[in-house]
Structure formats: C-alpha cells, structure tokens
C-alpha cells in the first residue's frame, strides 16, 4: 500500500477477511500457506499470531518481515490519499465480517471514498442493510444470468472476457456502471473502453491510468458539446416566447 501511494495510485483494490478473534485483515488468500508457509487458514488463528508471520519474503526478499495488515491500519494509511475498493471475502466462520468492515469505514469516515464489493450477493445485502449509502459492487466471474436488476448492487465488476456490448448496454439502461478485471494490456483496455466499460481494474496502473483519464476527458468534452447544442436549439424557442 505504501508503494501504491508513492506511485500516486488514486484507487486501490484490497481483499478483507477475518481472524479467529474477529480482526478484519487485508489478505487475498484464505489459506496462509502460499504467502507465509503456515498451513492454517486466516480464520483459524488470532491476529496476534497472524501478525508474527512473514508475509513478504515469498514475493521478494526486500519485503522480508512484512506482515498481514489490519483493515484499520490500511484505512488510516490511505485516508485522504486514495480511494479504496474493498472486496469482502466472507466465510461461514466469520459471520461478523460485514458489520466490522462497515464499522471501520464509518470510524474513518471513508464512506464517500470507497466502494464495497463481493462475489457474495448476500454480503452486499448485509452491507446495504447496515448502510444503504455505501456504494456496492457485485463481482462476477461469469457474465451470465439475470443479475442486472439486483437492488443491492450499484455496479458490476465482471471478468473482462465475458463483457459484451449488450451487457454494457443493459447495465447502463438501469443507471448502473460496469468495471472490468483484470486489465494489464493497453489493447485490452482500448477494446473495453470502446464497449463503454466505465472502469478498469489493473495490476499495471502506469499503463491503464492514462487511458482512463483520456477516456473520461473525452466524455467530459462530449457532455460539454451536448450542453452547447441544447442551448443553441433552445435559444430560438426562448426568443419566440418573448
């Protein structure tokens, strides 16, 4: 997270799970084996024990000694510096994860600077019950089924290979937006932006961010042009009324 902030990333995606003693932590894997060598799952251990595990050396020796941070630590670090995409990864072993995540979002006044996403629609429903104003996104690995009208999903985050122009159109018709993941090549980003995708999730912000900025700048110019045309055609009507 410190590296992402140093590179000026305006938005950061993270995954949230929970330890045995109810601490919300930021980690992708439920199993601790890949990142730490520990055979336990994250929900099996109290945070004091999880914090002692080296979660950085597997990636690169320069990160030796890095530990799995709490969600609270990440919120404190990123507050005022970056928006967050908080993916909740629920488990039958962690029934209070949604409530704890929302509590921390409120504690750090992060509601307007984050979105909460999940592959579990039930999780999104719980979040909306706790705070209807939090923006929620439904993560879909397959772009099939009738999901466009799900009330607890403000937007959809879809695996990029399943996105079609028709899907984008249906989502936009309902006043919702669509994000694509995970886009690391310029040509893939260009194709998705042409389809009308609203946002891209990437591991390569230095490649993708300029394309998104350019696309949004074009949208702003088109909106300005639309307003100018509307004013032009409205002017004669106003004169006739006089």
What are these regions (language model features)?
Residues 1-242:
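Phosphate-group recognition and catalysis centered on beta-loop-alpha active-site segments
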């Amino acid at each position: 997270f410190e590296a992402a902030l140093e590179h000026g990333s305006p938005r950061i995606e993270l995954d949230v799970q929970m330890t045995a003693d109810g601490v919300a932590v930021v980690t992708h894997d439920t199993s601790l084996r890949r990142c730490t060598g520990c055979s336990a799952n994250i929900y099996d251990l109290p945070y004091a024990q999880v914090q002692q595990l080296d979660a950085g050396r597997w990636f690169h020796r320069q990160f030796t000694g890095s530990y799995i941070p709490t969600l609270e630590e990440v919120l404190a670090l990123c507050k005022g510096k970056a928006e967050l995409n908080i993916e909740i990864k629920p488990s039958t072993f962690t029934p209070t994860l949604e409530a704890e995540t929302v509590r921390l979002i409120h504690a750090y006044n992060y509601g307007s600077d984050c979105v909460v996403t999940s592959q579990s629609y039930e999780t999104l429903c719980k979040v909306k019950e706790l705070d209807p104003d939090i923006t929620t996104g439904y993560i879909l690995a397959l772009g099939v089924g009738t999901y466009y009208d799900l009330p607890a999903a403000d937007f959809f985050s879809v695996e990029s290979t399943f996105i079609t122009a028709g899907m984008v159109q249906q989502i936009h018709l309902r006043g919702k937006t669509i994000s694509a993941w995970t886009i690391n090549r310029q040509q893939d980003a260009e194709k998705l932006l042409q389809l009308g995708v609203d946002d891209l999730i990437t591991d390569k912000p230095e490649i993708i961010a300029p394309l998104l900025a350019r696309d949004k700048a074009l949208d702003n110019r088109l909106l300005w042009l639309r307003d100018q045309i509307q004013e032009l055609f409205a002017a004669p009507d106003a004169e006739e009324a006089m």
